[in-house]
Amino acid sequence: MAKEVIQIIKLQLPAGKANPAPPVGPALGQHGVNIMEFCKAFNAKTQDKAGWIIPVEISVYSDRSFTFILKTPPASDLLKKAAGITSGAKNSKKEVAGKITTAKLKELAETKMPDLNASSVETAMKIIAGSARSMGIKIED
């Protein structure tokens, strides 16, 4: 018989820097998961992505074992790095925080494709463009 999933925990952690301190410790500890085992496995899988925030989905099973799936970095982080800014505009309707090209937008959309609910790259580009617009990032041809 397959193991029963008792909880799915979603966290966003810095790549290669997971440690037992909050938010990891309390989130996993209350389900009886071996926190250090998760931290070592997560850090090993994400050491090549240093500097990014990586969303992770942890499935905890009834026997206290776990599996986890790494997602792509949040669109806002990808956009900030692409535009070379530290934060989005305070008022995105009036301010322009940065600029990216359509080619860069397509590249970001292709990166995010596995995690987006989009059937084509064009649809994914529209989703990422909406995120860019809300952050005050202008898209140029």
UniProtKB/Swiss-Prot annotation:
Please give the InterPro entries that the UniProt record associates with this protein: Ribosomal_uL11, Ribosomal_uL11_bac-typ, Ribosomal_uL11_C, Ribosomal_uL11_C_sf, Ribosomal_uL11_CS, Ribosomal_uL11_N, Ribosomal_uL11_N_sf
Q: Which SMART domains match?
A: RL11
Q: Which GO terms describe its biological process?
A: translation
- In which domain of life is the source organism classified? Bacteria
PTM characteristics: One or more lysine residues are methylated.
Q: Does the keyword Oxidoreductase apply?
A: no
Q: Which CDD domains match?
A: Ribosomal_L11
Quote one Gene Ontology molecular function term: large ribosomal subunit rRNA binding
Keywords, alphabetical: Methylation, Ribonucleoprotein, Ribosomal protein, RNA-binding, rRNA-binding
**One cellular-component annotation, GO:** cytosolic large ribosomal subunit
Q: Per the similarity annotation, which family is this? A: Belongs to the universal ribosomal protein uL11 family.
Task: Briefly state the protein's biological role.
Answer: Forms part of the ribosomal stalk which helps the ribosome interact with GTP-bound translation factors.
HAMAP family per the UniProt record, alphabetical? Ribosomal_uL11
Assembly and binders: Part of the ribosomal stalk of the 50S ribosomal subunit. Interacts with L10 and the large rRNA to form the base of the stalk. L10 forms an elongated spine to which L12 dimers bind in a sequential fashion forming a multimeric L10(L12)X complex.
Quote the protein name from its UniProt record. Large ribosomal subunit protein uL11
Species assigned in the record: Fusobacterium nucleatum subsp. nucleatum (strain ATCC 25586 / DSM 15643 / BCRC 10681 / CIP 101130 / JCM 8532 / KCTC 2640 / LMG 13131 / VPI 4355)
Gene expressing this chain: rplK
